[in-house]
């Protein structure tokens, strides 16, 4: 059995670790709430742009924007959003597993895959397995800015516009609740149709657009795609903070359980030490 002094040192070390994990849990909780607010604030904007795009596209019968036309798929581009930091449980691993299964399904159809990556964990992983990375962004921090994200988005948009890829998808972790984050893969280009499109059934009117619907549609589509990617980045960030909060809480609880076990071992060691001292005193007295 380890000595009492050694056990006390271990208990102090675990207590220090417990303080760190508890602090990280509290920080993650605060950041998660702020990110949730940012996530909720951006959704109405994104949804409204999507409805306007749908309305303009339906009103411009003679014009079909390239972003709305489906093609035969030979190459697929993926924007994969991971985290820059670890200590967030299996969040990134689940994302990587899901995307690799998706890539394998495309490969079985003789369709090649190119990547645009957000987050250093994704960059390290996908480059290590030899996948083609067209663009990547790291170091977005806890308050991501649209200007930092636009580069990777435009790279994929231009690749689609130039016929270098025939479809663009986005993969990220969607925030369901504090205990649940779901890996999502969604199609960005060509733009999927709205489900339950109310405009098609309820509205027979149209607006007058200046300078013309085509120019406006092109501008709105770019803005919409940027907004969708930004929302996914914020969603993934909320998932990261939630996963880190849960992981750090589990680490804090485990540290508490370990301290209790070590304290019990320490008490037994201390008891054994006292018993030995008493035995020595009794033996010495008997010898006298």
Swiss-Prot record:
<dbReference type="InterPro" id="IPR035968">
    <property type="entry name" value="ATP_synth_F1_ATPase_gsu"/>
</dbReference>
<comment type="subunit">
    <text>F-type ATPases have 2 components, CF(1) - the catalytic core - and CF(0) - the membrane proton channel. CF(1) has five subunits: alpha(3), beta(3), gamma(1), delta(1), epsilon(1). CF(0) has three main subunits: a, b and c.</text>
</comment>
<protein>
    <recommendedName>
        <fullName>ATP synthase gamma chain</fullName>
    </recommendedName>
</protein>
<dbReference type="GO" id="GO:0042777">
    <property type="term" value="P:proton motive force-driven plasma membrane ATP synthesis"/>
</dbReference>
<keyword id="KW-0997">Cell inner membrane</keyword>
<keyword id="KW-1003">Cell membrane</keyword>
<dbReference type="Pfam" id="PF00231">
    <property type="entry name" value="ATP-synt"/>
</dbReference>
<dbReference type="GO" id="GO:0046933">
    <property type="term" value="F:proton-transporting ATP synthase activity, rotational mechanism"/>
</dbReference>
<dbReference type="GO" id="GO:0045259">
    <property type="term" value="C:proton-transporting ATP synthase complex"/>
</dbReference>
<dbReference type="GO" id="GO:0005886">
    <property type="term" value="C:plasma membrane"/>
</dbReference>
<keyword id="KW-0472">Membrane</keyword>
<keyword id="KW-0375">Hydrogen ion transport</keyword>
<keyword id="KW-0813">Transport</keyword>
<keyword id="KW-0406">Ion transport</keyword>
<keyword id="KW-0066">ATP synthesis</keyword>
<dbReference type="GO" id="GO:0005524">
    <property type="term" value="F:ATP binding"/>
</dbReference>
<dbReference type="InterPro" id="IPR023632">
    <property type="entry name" value="ATP_synth_F1_gsu_CS"/>
</dbReference>
<dbReference type="InterPro" id="IPR000131">
    <property type="entry name" value="ATP_synth_F1_gsu"/>
</dbReference>
<keyword id="KW-0139">CF(1)</keyword>
<comment type="similarity">
    <text>Belongs to the ATPase gamma chain family.</text>
</comment>
<comment type="function">
    <text>Produces ATP from ADP in the presence of a proton gradient across the membrane. The gamma chain is believed to be important in regulating ATPase activity and the flow of protons through the CF(0) complex.</text>
</comment>
